[in-house]
Amino acid sequence: MAFSWQEQIKPAGTQDIQCDIEYLDKSYIHVYLDGAETTGYTWTSATNIRLNTALAASTTVLLIRKTEREYLYIEFASGSPFIEVNVDSQNTQFLHLAQELVEGRAIPGFYGTISMNGYRITDLANPINAQDAATKAYVDTADTLLGQRIDAEHSGWVSAVHAEAVTRKAADDALSMRTSALENTFISGVETVSYPWSAVLTAATDEVTPGLAFTKAVVEINGVGQIRGYSFEIVDNTILFAEVLPAGTVVAARLGADVTAGDGFATQASVDYLANSLGDLAYLDKAAAVSDATSTGDVVAKLNALLAALRTSGVLAT
């Protein structure tokens, strides 16, 4: 039980406060509302304080006794009679000062912000509640743990960045290789896009739809290259063949790859097909029946002329 102070939480609308603290003079009682001292009140009796304005909200009301310590409440030297009541009052002043000192209310600022005036608070226990004071050892330990956590998270971040960089590099390298392969589709180095696709026909048909958007392709039937405009055509993302292909036929295509390039360029597919055809021609001993198609003219025109000669000689059936 405290002798020099009392604290209560009062609800909104409260105006009268009961003072249960013993005092020698009403001026020794100080009133604090939520930590701020107020003088907006009057005494209606020896134990009741009435606020000038009722509390607008729930408020912590603190009453503190601050007994005068700079002069004696009773001064016999000034003529106060040396009687029982005066002696008791004088001793009561000493008692109240001792209570306030022991309870800490005699220390200026104890009920508010505390100033240690440059001195330390020593022999503190470790904090438990959120508003407890922390010791240097506690703070240093927490700082060390925080540093370790930061280092660990940084290390993890560095590892993650490195792993992502490795993954990205692998993807970039793969993309670079694929891009180079696609660029090399043409002898001239003209870029194109090529998607390999193949299927084994489950039923006889004269058309296949790969399911991709394309307007050009290099097509093979059972490993034999086909000529666009002769043995197949492309319409609405579908390969249309000149004749019905039986079930079991293997159809392979590089979708998006040019069969002819024009403007003096030939595709790798065209050259490969030409080489295969010339090999067939020599094997069939029909080279003499094929006109010489080499000159400085347009490559595509000469290639078409050569293909026409191959068909005439019987090397090509279509």
Swiss-Prot record:
This is Anchor protein. The keyword Ribonucleoprotein does not apply. One of its GO terms (cellular component) is virus tail. The keyword Transmembrane helix does not apply. It comes from the Viruses. It holds the Pfam family Phage_T7_tail. Keywords: Viral tail protein, Virion. Anchors indirectly the receptor binding (RBP) protein (depolymerase) to the virion. InterPro entries: Phage_T7_tail_fibre-like_N (IPR005604). It is found in: Virion.
